[in-house]
Protein backbone atom coordinates (compact mmCIF):
# COMPACT_ATOMS: atom_id res chain seq x y z
CA UNK A 1 0.00 0.00 0.00
CA UNK A 2 1.23 3.52 -0.80
CA UNK A 3 1.08 6.44 1.62
CA UNK A 4 -2.45 7.52 2.59
CA UNK A 5 -4.22 9.64 0.02
CA UNK A 6 -5.03 13.22 0.95
CA UNK A 7 -8.01 15.50 0.57
CA UNK A 8 -7.97 18.03 -2.26
CA UNK A 9 -8.92 21.46 -0.89
CA UNK A 10 -8.24 24.88 -2.40
CA UNK A 11 -5.81 23.41 -4.91
CA UNK A 12 -3.73 21.64 -2.24
CA UNK A 13 -3.43 18.04 -1.09
CA UNK A 14 -4.04 18.17 2.66
CA UNK A 15 -4.50 15.82 5.60
CA UNK A 16 -7.55 15.77 7.83
CA UNK A 17 -7.73 17.66 11.09
CA UNK A 18 -8.36 14.31 12.78
CA UNK A 19 -5.02 12.83 11.77
CA UNK A 20 -6.88 9.59 11.13
CA UNK A 21 -7.23 7.51 7.99
CA UNK A 22 -9.60 4.77 6.84
CA UNK A 23 -8.29 1.67 5.07
CA UNK A 24 -9.98 0.30 1.97
CA UNK A 25 -9.65 -3.43 1.37
CA UNK A 26 -10.07 -5.56 -1.73
CA UNK A 27 -13.57 -7.14 -1.68
CA UNK A 28 -12.18 -10.18 -3.50
CA UNK A 29 -9.51 -10.58 -0.80
CA UNK A 30 -10.41 -8.57 2.32
CA UNK A 31 -7.04 -9.19 3.95
CA UNK A 32 -5.44 -7.05 1.23
CA UNK A 33 -5.38 -3.35 2.10
CA UNK A 34 -5.61 -1.46 -1.18
CA UNK A 35 -5.29 2.13 0.06
CA UNK A 36 -5.99 4.48 2.95
CA UNK A 37 -7.90 7.75 2.82
CA UNK A 38 -8.46 10.68 5.15
CA UNK A 39 -11.06 10.16 7.89
CA UNK A 40 -12.25 13.73 7.80
CA UNK A 41 -14.56 15.64 10.14
CA UNK A 42 -16.95 18.59 10.01
CA UNK A 43 -14.15 21.16 10.15
CA UNK A 44 -12.42 19.61 7.15
CA UNK A 45 -15.71 19.76 5.24
CA UNK A 46 -16.33 23.36 6.30
CA UNK A 47 -12.87 24.37 5.08
CA UNK A 48 -13.68 22.85 1.70
CA UNK A 49 -16.93 24.84 1.51
CA UNK A 50 -15.06 28.03 2.40
CA UNK A 51 -12.63 27.39 -0.45
CA UNK A 52 -15.48 26.79 -2.90
CA UNK A 53 -17.24 29.99 -1.83
CA UNK A 54 -14.04 31.99 -2.26
CA UNK A 55 -13.54 30.61 -5.78
CA UNK A 56 -17.11 31.32 -6.97
CA UNK A 57 -16.60 34.68 -8.66
CA UNK A 58 -13.47 33.68 -10.56
CA UNK A 59 -14.99 30.48 -11.93
CA UNK A 60 -18.42 31.84 -12.86
CA UNK A 61 -16.68 34.65 -14.75
CA UNK A 62 -14.28 32.31 -16.53
CA UNK A 63 -15.37 32.20 -20.20
CA UNK A 64 -17.31 29.07 -21.11
CA UNK A 65 -14.80 27.97 -23.76
CA UNK A 66 -12.03 28.05 -21.15
CA UNK A 67 -14.10 26.02 -18.70
CA UNK A 68 -14.73 23.58 -21.54
CA UNK A 69 -11.03 23.38 -22.37
CA UNK A 70 -10.23 22.37 -18.80
CA UNK A 71 -12.92 19.67 -18.79
CA UNK A 72 -11.76 18.37 -22.16
CA UNK A 73 -8.13 18.24 -21.03
CA UNK A 74 -9.13 16.44 -17.83
CA UNK A 75 -11.01 13.86 -19.90
CA UNK A 76 -7.96 13.36 -22.07
CA UNK A 77 -5.76 12.84 -19.00
CA UNK A 78 -8.23 10.28 -17.65
CA UNK A 79 -8.13 8.49 -21.01
CA UNK A 80 -4.35 8.30 -20.83
CA UNK A 81 -4.67 6.67 -17.39
CA UNK A 82 -7.57 4.37 -18.26
CA UNK A 83 -5.76 1.14 -17.41
CA UNK A 84 -4.63 2.50 -14.04
CA UNK A 85 -8.12 3.75 -13.20
CA UNK A 86 -9.60 0.38 -14.17
CA UNK A 87 -7.22 -1.37 -11.78
CA UNK A 88 -8.09 1.01 -8.93
CA UNK A 89 -11.82 0.55 -9.52
CA UNK A 90 -11.63 -3.25 -9.63
CA UNK A 91 -9.38 -3.38 -6.55
CA UNK A 92 -11.60 -1.13 -4.43
CA UNK A 93 -15.14 -1.86 -5.66
CA UNK A 94 -14.71 -5.38 -7.06
CA UNK A 95 -16.20 -4.98 -10.54
CA UNK A 96 -15.16 -7.40 -13.25
CA UNK A 97 -12.42 -5.75 -15.28
CA UNK A 98 -14.47 -5.30 -18.49
CA UNK A 99 -17.23 -3.64 -16.46
CA UNK A 100 -14.71 -1.42 -14.70
CA UNK A 101 -13.07 -0.43 -17.98
CA UNK A 102 -16.47 0.40 -19.43
CA UNK A 103 -17.29 2.59 -16.46
CA UNK A 104 -14.00 4.47 -16.74
CA UNK A 105 -14.65 5.05 -20.42
CA UNK A 106 -18.09 6.41 -19.56
CA UNK A 107 -16.49 8.95 -17.21
CA UNK A 108 -14.06 10.00 -19.94
CA UNK A 109 -16.93 10.41 -22.41
CA UNK A 110 -18.91 12.47 -19.89
CA UNK A 111 -16.09 14.97 -19.44
CA UNK A 112 -15.68 15.32 -23.18
CA UNK A 113 -19.45 15.67 -23.69
CA UNK A 114 -19.90 18.44 -21.13
CA UNK A 115 -16.74 20.21 -22.26
CA UNK A 116 -18.66 21.20 -25.38
CA UNK A 117 -21.67 22.33 -23.33
CA UNK A 118 -19.67 24.85 -21.30
CA UNK A 119 -19.42 27.18 -24.30
CA UNK A 120 -23.03 26.67 -25.33
CA UNK A 121 -25.20 27.12 -22.25
CA UNK A 122 -28.84 27.68 -23.03
CA UNK A 123 -30.56 30.99 -23.45
CA UNK A 124 -33.12 32.34 -25.87
CA UNK A 125 -33.91 35.62 -27.58
CA UNK A 126 -37.59 36.60 -27.57
CA UNK A 127 -39.60 39.26 -29.30
CA UNK A 128 -40.56 42.16 -26.99
CA UNK A 129 -44.06 43.65 -27.09
CA UNK A 130 -42.72 47.19 -27.43
CA UNK A 131 -40.08 48.88 -29.60
CA UNK A 132 -36.39 49.36 -28.82
CA UNK A 133 -36.12 46.42 -26.43
CA UNK A 134 -33.96 43.32 -26.61
CA UNK A 135 -35.60 40.54 -24.61
CA UNK A 136 -33.62 37.41 -23.86
CA UNK A 137 -32.85 34.77 -21.24
CA UNK A 138 -29.54 33.40 -20.02
CA UNK A 139 -28.50 30.48 -17.83
CA UNK A 140 -26.22 31.24 -14.91
CA UNK A 141 -24.55 29.05 -12.27
CA UNK A 142 -26.37 28.50 -8.99
CA UNK A 143 -23.34 28.69 -6.69
CA UNK A 144 -21.61 26.01 -4.63
CA UNK A 145 -22.70 22.45 -5.40
CA UNK A 146 -22.36 19.72 -2.76
CA UNK A 147 -22.03 16.32 -4.44
CA UNK A 148 -22.36 13.09 -2.43
CA UNK A 149 -21.67 10.00 -4.51
CA UNK A 150 -22.01 6.20 -4.04
CA UNK A 151 -19.63 3.26 -4.25
CA UNK A 152 -21.37 1.18 -6.92
CA UNK A 153 -20.36 3.42 -9.84
CA UNK A 154 -17.47 5.22 -8.14
CA UNK A 155 -16.21 7.11 -11.20
CA UNK A 156 -19.19 7.37 -13.58
CA UNK A 157 -21.65 8.89 -11.12
CA UNK A 158 -19.21 11.49 -9.76
CA UNK A 159 -18.37 12.37 -13.36
CA UNK A 160 -21.99 12.86 -14.40
CA UNK A 161 -22.56 15.20 -11.46
CA UNK A 162 -19.23 17.02 -11.49
CA UNK A 163 -18.82 17.70 -15.21
CA UNK A 164 -22.12 19.58 -15.69
CA UNK A 165 -21.65 21.42 -12.40
CA UNK A 166 -18.27 22.74 -13.53
CA UNK A 167 -19.38 23.34 -17.12
CA UNK A 168 -22.18 25.59 -15.85
CA UNK A 169 -19.77 27.64 -13.73
CA UNK A 170 -20.48 26.29 -10.24
CA UNK A 171 -17.82 25.49 -7.70
CA UNK A 172 -17.97 22.09 -6.02
CA UNK A 173 -17.42 20.21 -2.80
CA UNK A 174 -17.51 16.44 -3.30
CA UNK A 175 -17.68 13.55 -0.85
CA UNK A 176 -17.05 10.19 -2.53
CA UNK A 177 -18.13 6.92 -0.97
CA UNK A 178 -15.68 5.81 1.72
CA UNK A 179 -15.57 2.26 0.35
CA UNK A 180 -14.16 3.22 -3.07
CA UNK A 181 -12.92 6.82 -3.29
CA UNK A 182 -9.72 6.22 -5.24
CA UNK A 183 -11.00 7.02 -8.72
CA UNK A 184 -12.53 10.31 -7.53
CA UNK A 185 -9.14 11.33 -6.17
CA UNK A 186 -7.77 10.67 -9.65
CA UNK A 187 -10.48 12.88 -11.21
CA UNK A 188 -9.36 15.69 -8.91
CA UNK A 189 -5.75 15.07 -9.91
CA UNK A 190 -6.63 15.25 -13.61
CA UNK A 191 -8.60 18.49 -13.22
CA UNK A 192 -5.78 20.01 -11.20
CA UNK A 193 -3.27 19.13 -13.91
CA UNK A 194 -5.66 20.49 -16.55
CA UNK A 195 -5.50 23.92 -14.91
CA UNK A 196 -8.64 24.10 -12.78
CA UNK A 197 -8.32 27.19 -10.54
CA UNK A 198 -7.79 26.64 -6.82
CA UNK A 199 -10.95 26.08 -4.81
CA UNK A 200 -13.22 25.30 -7.75
CA UNK A 201 -13.23 21.59 -6.85
CA UNK A 202 -12.70 20.30 -3.32
CA UNK A 203 -12.75 16.58 -2.49
CA UNK A 204 -13.05 15.44 1.12
CA UNK A 205 -13.17 11.77 2.15
CA UNK A 206 -14.81 10.59 5.34
CA UNK A 207 -18.10 9.54 6.92
CA UNK A 208 -21.40 10.83 5.62
CA UNK A 209 -22.44 11.64 9.19
CA UNK A 210 -19.72 14.28 9.43
CA UNK A 211 -18.53 15.31 5.95
CA UNK A 212 -21.82 14.79 4.11
CA UNK A 213 -23.95 16.39 6.81
CA UNK A 214 -21.69 19.44 6.95
CA UNK A 215 -21.82 19.85 3.19
CA UNK A 216 -25.63 19.72 3.28
CA UNK A 217 -26.13 21.99 6.28
CA UNK A 218 -23.37 24.53 5.67
CA UNK A 219 -24.82 27.90 4.65
CA UNK A 220 -22.14 28.23 1.97
CA UNK A 221 -23.57 25.46 -0.22
CA UNK A 222 -26.47 26.26 -2.53
CA UNK A 223 -27.45 22.91 -4.03
CA UNK A 224 -27.05 19.25 -3.10
CA UNK A 225 -26.91 16.25 -5.43
CA UNK A 226 -27.01 12.82 -3.78
CA UNK A 227 -27.02 9.28 -5.14
CA UNK A 228 -27.47 6.37 -2.76
CA UNK A 229 -30.06 4.34 -0.89
CA UNK A 230 -33.64 5.55 -0.62
CA UNK A 231 -33.51 5.52 3.17
CA UNK A 232 -30.48 7.82 3.35
CA UNK A 233 -31.54 9.86 0.34
CA UNK A 234 -34.89 10.74 1.86
CA UNK A 235 -33.10 12.04 4.97
CA UNK A 236 -30.72 14.03 2.76
CA UNK A 237 -33.67 15.49 0.86
CA UNK A 238 -35.39 16.58 4.06
CA UNK A 239 -32.21 18.08 5.55
CA UNK A 240 -31.33 19.94 2.36
CA UNK A 241 -34.81 21.31 1.71
CA UNK A 242 -35.14 22.40 5.34
CA UNK A 243 -31.90 24.33 4.83
CA UNK A 244 -33.34 26.00 1.73
CA UNK A 245 -31.10 24.20 -0.76
CA UNK A 246 -31.92 23.06 -4.26
CA UNK A 247 -31.71 19.26 -4.02
CA UNK A 248 -31.48 16.35 -6.42
CA UNK A 249 -31.62 12.70 -5.31
CA UNK A 250 -31.19 9.48 -7.30
CA UNK A 251 -32.11 6.53 -5.12
CA UNK A 252 -33.18 2.90 -5.29
CA UNK A 253 -35.03 0.73 -7.74
CA UNK A 254 -37.01 -2.52 -7.95
CA UNK A 255 -36.76 -2.82 -11.68
CA UNK A 256 -38.93 -5.25 -13.68
CA UNK A 257 -38.51 -6.96 -17.01
CA UNK A 258 -41.88 -8.07 -18.36
CA UNK A 259 -41.54 -11.17 -20.55
CA UNK A 260 -44.55 -11.40 -22.87
CA UNK A 261 -46.00 -14.57 -24.38
CA UNK A 262 -44.49 -13.62 -27.76
CA UNK A 263 -40.96 -13.44 -26.35
CA UNK A 264 -38.24 -15.91 -27.21
CA UNK A 265 -37.41 -17.48 -23.81
CA UNK A 266 -33.68 -17.74 -24.51
CA UNK A 267 -33.41 -14.13 -25.65
CA UNK A 268 -35.47 -12.97 -22.68
CA UNK A 269 -33.22 -14.93 -20.30
CA UNK A 270 -30.16 -13.25 -21.80
CA UNK A 271 -31.73 -9.84 -21.20
CA UNK A 272 -32.72 -10.62 -17.61
CA UNK A 273 -29.40 -12.27 -16.75
CA UNK A 274 -27.42 -9.34 -18.11
CA UNK A 275 -29.62 -6.89 -16.25
CA UNK A 276 -29.81 -8.85 -13.01
CA UNK A 277 -26.33 -10.34 -12.63
CA UNK A 278 -24.19 -7.69 -14.33
CA UNK A 279 -22.09 -5.63 -11.89
CA UNK A 280 -23.04 -8.32 -9.33
CA UNK A 281 -26.54 -6.86 -9.20
CA UNK A 282 -25.15 -3.78 -7.47
CA UNK A 283 -26.87 -1.23 -9.66
CA UNK A 284 -29.89 0.93 -8.97
CA UNK A 285 -31.20 -0.09 -12.41
CA UNK A 286 -30.53 -3.84 -12.01
CA UNK A 287 -33.34 -6.19 -13.00
CA UNK A 288 -34.53 -7.82 -9.78
CA UNK A 289 -37.99 -8.90 -11.01
CA UNK A 290 -38.74 -11.01 -14.08
CA UNK A 291 -42.50 -10.90 -14.65
CA UNK A 292 -43.19 -13.76 -17.05
CA UNK A 293 -46.26 -14.84 -19.03
CA UNK A 294 -47.41 -18.34 -18.10
CA UNK A 295 -47.06 -19.61 -21.68
CA UNK A 296 -43.28 -19.11 -21.68
CA UNK A 297 -42.67 -19.34 -17.93
CA UNK A 298 -41.16 -22.84 -17.71
CA UNK A 299 -38.87 -22.41 -20.71
CA UNK A 300 -37.75 -18.99 -19.50
CA UNK A 301 -36.93 -20.28 -16.00
CA UNK A 302 -34.87 -23.14 -17.43
CA UNK A 303 -32.91 -20.72 -19.61
CA UNK A 304 -32.33 -18.23 -16.76
CA UNK A 305 -31.18 -20.97 -14.38
CA UNK A 306 -28.72 -22.16 -17.03
CA UNK A 307 -27.24 -18.67 -17.31
CA UNK A 308 -27.02 -18.22 -13.55
CA UNK A 309 -25.26 -21.53 -13.07
CA UNK A 310 -22.81 -20.95 -15.92
CA UNK A 311 -21.57 -17.54 -14.74
CA UNK A 312 -17.91 -17.55 -13.71
CA UNK A 313 -17.77 -15.97 -10.24
CA UNK A 314 -14.48 -14.78 -8.78
CA UNK A 315 -12.09 -11.84 -8.45
CA UNK A 316 -12.93 -9.13 -10.94
CA UNK A 317 -9.44 -9.25 -12.38
CA UNK A 318 -10.17 -12.40 -14.38
CA UNK A 319 -13.77 -13.56 -13.82
CA UNK A 320 -17.18 -12.66 -15.24
CA UNK A 321 -18.88 -11.65 -11.98
CA UNK A 322 -16.97 -10.13 -9.11
CA UNK A 323 -17.70 -9.96 -5.37
CA UNK A 324 -20.08 -7.77 -3.48
CA UNK A 325 -18.37 -4.64 -2.29
CA UNK A 326 -18.33 -5.42 1.45
CA UNK A 327 -19.18 -7.94 4.13
CA UNK A 328 -22.26 -5.93 5.08
CA UNK A 329 -23.58 -5.93 1.50
CA UNK A 330 -22.99 -9.68 1.23
CA UNK A 331 -24.75 -10.26 4.54
CA UNK A 332 -27.72 -8.19 3.38
CA UNK A 333 -28.06 -10.22 0.18
CA UNK A 334 -27.83 -13.53 2.05
CA UNK A 335 -30.43 -12.29 4.53
CA UNK A 336 -32.85 -11.51 1.70
CA UNK A 337 -32.28 -14.99 0.29
CA UNK A 338 -33.22 -16.47 3.67
CA UNK A 339 -36.28 -14.22 3.87
CA UNK A 340 -37.44 -15.30 0.42
CA UNK A 341 -37.19 -18.98 1.33
CA UNK A 342 -39.00 -18.37 4.61
CA UNK A 343 -41.83 -16.60 2.75
CA UNK A 344 -42.28 -19.59 0.44
CA UNK A 345 -40.37 -18.70 -2.71
CA UNK A 346 -38.61 -21.61 -4.43
CA UNK A 347 -34.83 -21.37 -4.81
CA UNK A 348 -33.90 -22.78 -8.22
CA UNK A 349 -30.36 -21.41 -8.68
CA UNK A 350 -27.61 -20.16 -6.41
CA UNK A 351 -28.61 -18.96 -2.99
CA UNK A 352 -25.31 -19.24 -1.20
CA UNK A 353 -21.59 -18.55 -1.16
CA UNK A 354 -19.72 -20.23 -4.03
CA UNK A 355 -17.02 -22.78 -3.37
CA UNK A 356 -13.48 -22.93 -4.72
CA UNK A 357 -10.03 -21.54 -4.08
CA UNK A 358 -10.63 -18.34 -6.06
CA UNK A 359 -13.64 -17.36 -3.95
CA UNK A 360 -12.83 -18.68 -0.50
CA UNK A 361 -11.85 -15.34 1.06
CA UNK A 362 -13.92 -12.65 -0.69
CA UNK A 363 -17.46 -11.27 -0.45
CA UNK A 364 -18.83 -13.62 -3.10
CA UNK A 365 -22.38 -14.80 -3.62
CA UNK A 366 -23.87 -17.06 -6.29
CA UNK A 367 -26.18 -15.63 -8.95
CA UNK A 368 -29.56 -16.49 -7.49
CA UNK A 369 -32.99 -17.18 -9.00
CA UNK A 370 -36.30 -17.62 -7.16
CA UNK A 371 -39.56 -18.89 -8.64
CA UNK A 372 -43.05 -19.18 -7.15
CA UNK A 373 -42.69 -15.58 -6.04
CA UNK A 374 -45.79 -13.74 -4.91
CA UNK A 375 -45.72 -10.03 -5.86
CA UNK A 376 -46.26 -9.09 -2.19
CA UNK A 377 -43.19 -10.96 -0.93
CA UNK A 378 -40.33 -8.81 0.33
CA UNK A 379 -38.05 -10.27 -2.35
CA UNK A 380 -40.45 -8.75 -4.92
CA UNK A 381 -40.94 -5.41 -3.16
CA UNK A 382 -37.63 -4.36 -1.58
CA UNK A 383 -34.32 -3.49 -3.21
CA UNK A 384 -31.83 -6.31 -2.61
CA UNK A 385 -28.71 -4.85 -4.30
CA UNK A 386 -27.21 -8.19 -5.13
CA UNK A 387 -27.44 -10.75 -7.99
CA UNK A 388 -30.90 -12.01 -7.08
CA UNK A 389 -33.81 -12.27 -9.55
CA UNK A 390 -37.37 -13.02 -8.45
CA UNK A 391 -39.46 -14.66 -11.19
CA UNK A 392 -43.18 -13.89 -11.02
CA UNK A 393 -45.70 -15.77 -13.19
CA UNK A 394 -48.63 -13.84 -14.71
CA UNK A 395 -51.54 -14.86 -16.92
CA UNK A 396 -51.61 -11.90 -19.31
CA UNK A 397 -50.12 -8.53 -20.21
CA UNK A 398 -52.47 -6.50 -18.01
CA UNK A 399 -51.61 -8.53 -14.93
CA UNK A 400 -47.91 -8.22 -15.72
CA UNK A 401 -48.14 -4.45 -16.09
CA UNK A 402 -50.03 -4.16 -12.80
CA UNK A 403 -47.36 -6.22 -11.03
CA UNK A 404 -44.60 -4.12 -12.59
CA UNK A 405 -46.14 -0.94 -11.19
CA UNK A 406 -47.05 -2.34 -7.77
CA UNK A 407 -43.88 -1.26 -5.96
CA UNK A 408 -42.68 1.93 -4.27
CA UNK A 409 -39.97 2.47 -6.88
CA UNK A 410 -40.01 3.56 -10.50
CA UNK A 411 -36.50 3.85 -11.88
CA UNK A 412 -36.06 1.49 -14.84
CA UNK A 413 -38.31 -1.05 -16.56
CA UNK A 414 -38.15 -3.17 -19.69
CA UNK A 415 -40.35 -5.45 -21.76
CA UNK A 416 -39.42 -8.35 -24.03
CA UNK A 417 -42.07 -8.77 -26.73
CA UNK A 418 -42.68 -9.12 -30.45
CA UNK A 419 -46.03 -7.35 -30.11
CA UNK A 420 -45.67 -3.67 -31.04
CA UNK A 421 -48.99 -2.77 -29.43
CA UNK A 422 -47.89 -4.31 -26.12
CA UNK A 423 -44.59 -2.49 -26.34
CA UNK A 424 -46.31 0.85 -26.86
CA UNK A 425 -48.75 0.23 -24.02
CA UNK A 426 -45.86 -0.66 -21.73
CA UNK A 427 -44.01 2.54 -22.63
CA UNK A 428 -47.17 4.56 -22.00
CA UNK A 429 -48.31 2.93 -18.77
CA UNK A 430 -45.31 1.63 -16.84
CA UNK A 431 -44.32 3.86 -13.93
CA UNK A 432 -40.60 4.29 -14.54
CA UNK A 433 -38.28 7.08 -15.58
CA UNK A 434 -36.31 4.83 -17.94
CA UNK A 435 -38.18 2.38 -20.19
CA UNK A 436 -36.62 -0.11 -22.58
CA UNK A 437 -38.10 -2.40 -25.21
CA UNK A 438 -36.30 -5.71 -25.87
CA UNK A 439 -33.32 -4.62 -23.82
CA UNK A 440 -32.02 -4.95 -20.27
CA UNK A 441 -32.95 -2.49 -17.52
CA UNK A 442 -29.33 -1.45 -17.02
CA UNK A 443 -27.17 0.64 -19.32
CA UNK A 444 -27.66 4.35 -19.99
CA UNK A 445 -26.77 6.80 -22.72
CA UNK A 446 -24.97 9.88 -21.41
CA UNK A 447 -26.73 12.41 -23.65
CA UNK A 448 -30.32 11.75 -22.52
CA UNK A 449 -31.97 12.39 -19.13
CA UNK A 450 -31.82 9.83 -16.32
CA UNK A 451 -34.09 9.68 -13.29
CA UNK A 452 -37.01 7.84 -11.77
CA UNK A 453 -40.52 8.08 -10.41
CA UNK A 454 -41.88 7.54 -6.89
CA UNK A 455 -39.21 6.69 -4.27
CA UNK A 456 -36.51 6.29 -6.91
CA UNK A 457 -35.64 9.98 -7.20
CA UNK A 458 -36.64 13.57 -6.70
CA UNK A 459 -38.64 13.93 -9.89
CA UNK A 460 -37.97 17.66 -10.36
CA UNK A 461 -34.38 17.29 -11.55
CA UNK A 462 -32.87 14.78 -13.98
CA UNK A 463 -29.23 13.88 -14.48
CA UNK A 464 -27.19 13.53 -17.69
CA UNK A 465 -27.73 15.09 -21.09
CA UNK A 466 -28.90 18.67 -21.48
CA UNK A 467 -31.31 18.08 -18.60
CA UNK A 468 -28.29 17.40 -16.40
CA UNK A 469 -27.28 21.05 -16.78
CA UNK A 470 -30.65 22.36 -15.63
CA UNK A 471 -30.03 21.44 -11.99
CA UNK A 472 -26.79 23.42 -11.99
CA UNK A 473 -28.16 26.57 -13.64
CA UNK A 474 -30.72 29.25 -12.92
CA UNK A 475 -32.44 31.23 -15.64
CA UNK A 476 -32.31 35.02 -15.79
CA UNK A 477 -34.60 37.09 -18.01
CA UNK A 478 -33.15 40.35 -19.39
CA UNK A 479 -35.05 43.37 -20.77
CA UNK A 480 -32.53 45.59 -22.55
CA UNK A 481 -34.19 48.82 -23.69
CA UNK A 482 -32.45 51.46 -25.76
From Swiss-Prot:
A Gene Ontology BP annotation from the UniProt entry: D-xylose catabolic process
Record-given protein name: Alpha-ketoglutarate semialdehyde dehydrogenase
E.C. number(s) listed in UniProt: 1.2.1.26
Intrachain S-S bonds: none
Any GO molecular function: 2,5-dioxovalerate dehydrogenase (NADP+) activity
Record field: compositional bias (Low complexity): 11-25
Induction: Transcriptionally up-regulated by both L-arabinose and D-xylose via the pentose-specific regulator XacR. Expression is repressed by glucose.
Subunit-structure text: Homotetramer.
Source taxon at top rank: Archaea
Catalytic reaction annotation: 2,5-dioxopentanoate + NADP(+) + H2O = 2-oxoglutarate + NADPH + 2 H(+)
Main EC class the enzyme belongs to: oxidoreductase
UniProt function note: Alpha-ketoglutarate semialdehyde dehydrogenase involved in the degradation of D-xylose, a major component of hemicelluloses such as xylan. Catalyzes the fifth reaction in the xylose utilization pathway through dehydratation of alpha-ketoglutarate semialdehyde (2,5-dioxopentanoate) into alpha-ketoglutarate.
Active-site feature positions: 284
Pathway the protein acts in: Carbohydrate metabolism; D-xylose degradation
UniProt-annotated stretches for the region Disordered: 1-28
Assigned protein family: Belongs to the aldehyde dehydrogenase family.
Phenotype of null mutants: Impairs growth on D-xylose as sole energy and carbon substrate.
Cell inner membrane among keywords: no
Keywords annotated in UniProt: Carbohydrate metabolism, NADP, Oxidoreductase, Plasmid
Record Pfam families: Aldedh (PF00171)
Amino acid sequence: MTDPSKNYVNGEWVTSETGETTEVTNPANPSEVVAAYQHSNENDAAAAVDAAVAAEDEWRNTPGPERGRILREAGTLLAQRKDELTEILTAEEGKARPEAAGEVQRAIDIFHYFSSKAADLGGTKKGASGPNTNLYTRQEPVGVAALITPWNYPIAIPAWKLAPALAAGNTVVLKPASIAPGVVIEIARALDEAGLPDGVLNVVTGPGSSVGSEFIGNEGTDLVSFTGSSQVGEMVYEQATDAGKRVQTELGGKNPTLVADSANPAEAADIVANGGFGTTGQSCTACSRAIVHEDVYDDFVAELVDRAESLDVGPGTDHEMGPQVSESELSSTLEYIDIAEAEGATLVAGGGVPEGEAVETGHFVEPTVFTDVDPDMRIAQEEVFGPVVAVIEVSDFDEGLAVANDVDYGLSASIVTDDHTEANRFVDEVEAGVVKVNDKTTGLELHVPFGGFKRSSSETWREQGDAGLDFYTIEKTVYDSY
